[in-house]
Amino acid sequence: MNEQQRLASQQANSSTKKEEKDYSKYFESVYQPPSLKDAKKRGKEEVKIERDFGLPEEFRNFGTGRKFYIRTYGCQMNEHDTEVMAGIFTALGYEPTFSTEDADVVLLNTCAIRENAENKVFGELGHLKSLKRRNPDFLIGVCGCMSQEESVVNKIMQKNQHVDMVFGTHNIHRLPYILKDAMFSKETVVEVWSKEGDVIENLPKVRRGDIKAWVNIMYGCDKFCTYCIVPYTRGKERSRRPEDIIQEIRHLAANGYKEITLLGQNVNAYGKDFEDIEYGLGDLMDELRKVDIARIRFTTSHPRDFDDHLIEVLGKGGNLVEHIHLPVQSGSTDMLKIMARKYSREHYLELVRKIKEAIPDAVLTTDIIVGFPNETDEQFEETMSLYREVGFDTAFTFIYSPREGTPAAKMKDNVPMEVKKERLQRLNTLVNTLAIEKNSRYKGQIVEVLVDGESKNNPEVLAGYTRTNKLVNFVASKSLIGQLVKVKITEAKTWSLNGELVEEPIEVK
């Protein structure tokens, strides 16, 4: 997005403003909420790659003596965005804190995927109001996907006037300017771009750990499933250039990271927006096989774009793991059509067959929605039968939650809640049954585990994950944290495995 487009999406009097790329010129408060109607549009505007991000001199030591706190809701993409915002705060001179009471600035990085996530955010805003009363200089910000919704921004402006700033998913690189504006404004500063921005490289990051890292390979989604708000909140599909991704991953490998997760709302669409080269996710994964790093995985996949070349590359193994998260949402072709998933039950099963043929040890997990409008008992049974036929290791299961602004929200929600809950319970029983059955096959096997750290339930126990994303708990020295070890599985549980260390750190080959 260029500056002209940014102003047009935010200010009613945009035609009177200077159409310059120098964002620092604009500090005036903006009070117009975003537009989901505008966010749906997919124009031909060129998305630029900006590689010269830098902090203007005026912001040096801007945050010295101040502390920040970011609370993150939702997906890995939000976690990655938080790492970027933490990097910007640190570059400004702020120090991190793990307490809202100790912070000078609190950001809530929000998720819009379900109503429950939004309720949590508004509940937290209520708690923060007392801190604002005690300290008028205390800054509260709301960012992330919720900020891209008109109804949310309007609710904040009307009922949560103690919030100082609201910004969205497309302009987190403008955080220094938004902070400065919020400090001196007497009203809520709203800077939400309805349309996506450029791809900004070289943004600072404070990564959550030094063992595993998330790397964005693309942004946005053009699939417009009828239930999903993401294409509106994250914008159109924009791919990072492969050389930028490979350089970032090589840098992480050189700094000792063992595992990389490639991120995108739909990673299988990677490269489809390139006009100068034919290059997709399979090509990228083939190049990343040559990088000296132990494991590479990706999320989230869309069955519609999962092509044969990618399957062929994944079958080569090496540092490409055998775990694939492949959301199906429903086992009924009729339901999939209403959801606008653009594939059938048969297409999905054929894709699974190809994956298992190329990767015999592949572990598949999925997402499933129950109680979508018009879902019949027979259609739900199709979902149950597909789950058994594929033999998923586990699934994230949800009761349908209408999201304002999506086509499905206009459909009659005609499945009674008691029916939705009963279906979810039945599905979860099946998920749990297959999960313990799948995990039991690991008993007696020796598996490779990347040690994450101490178990959340017992600090005397170490916890880590296999290549197939199985949680393994075992007793060993804490010096092994961050290392790849061999563990013999002694006990299988529904959601985890217990084992014994049989071999200390192994070399990455």
UniProtKB/Swiss-Prot annotation:
- State the EC number(s): 2.8.4.3
Q: Where is the composition biased (Polar residues)?
A: 1-15
NAD as a keyword? no
Residues in domain TRAM? 440-503
Cite the SUPFAM superfamilies for this sequence: Radical SAM enzymes
Give residues annotated as binding [4Fe-4S] cluster 1.
75, 111, 145
Designated name of the protein: tRNA-2-methylthio-N(6)-dimethylallyladenosine synthase
Natural source organism: Bacillus cereus (strain ATCC 14579 / DSM 31 / CCUG 7414 / JCM 2152 / NBRC 15305 / NCIMB 9373 / NCTC 2599 / NRRL B-3711)
